[in-house]
Amino acid sequence: MEESNKTTLIPALISANKAKSILIFCNMKITCDKLADDLYNLGLDVLTLHSDLEQKQRDETIILFSNKSYPILIATDVASRGLHIDDVDLVINYDLSLDEKIHTHRIGRTARAGKGGMAISLYTHNDYDRVELIKDTFTDIQEESVDKIEDDLSYKIDSELRTIFINGGKKQKLRAGDILGAMTAGIGLKKEDIGKIDILDFASYVAINKEKIAYVLTELSKSKIKGKYYRIYEK
């Protein structure tokens, strides 16, 4: 395929595989940022993870992807080393990895916790040597022409969740149960509208049904969590 066609192919790959959590690997951070801008212009919500981000930004990015607030994470190999995220159902190698060990590490993201998934590698005629190396190592690879990809135009690439930030965490003795109670018994939110709760030392992140975000921001800002008011906003 042509390099210029890679970006426009990604929505088709996602919809064809009905993917909800997509990890895209690029070899360089400049490619990550360019691809993120291009996909955003196509109407997709994306996050990036590379070495230009400070550790706090990396941690927050991982939280927002792992709690399903954003469906797509674009990452470099260095930044994603040691990354533990379950339920990734599609890995796309936008750039082919530089060796088979990195390739193994990438595609293994879809098999965590005994779960399956799909890994797709995009390549051009300039990648011939790397393609042959990967084929020699992974004998069960199936090659497919881009013309055979069946795009499901009815599939919506989006997340049902968004995340709220609370400026209090473990150092303020906050626990997941405290936040859950403030949202359910406190402001009347249903448990099914609340997703993953991540509590760090000085901050907490809560995935919320995006249809309820405005309500939660308004009501929780006026309510106490474990006897104290906290600053709350959407990430």
Say what each PLM segment does.
Residues 1-235:
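Conserved helicase RecA-like core
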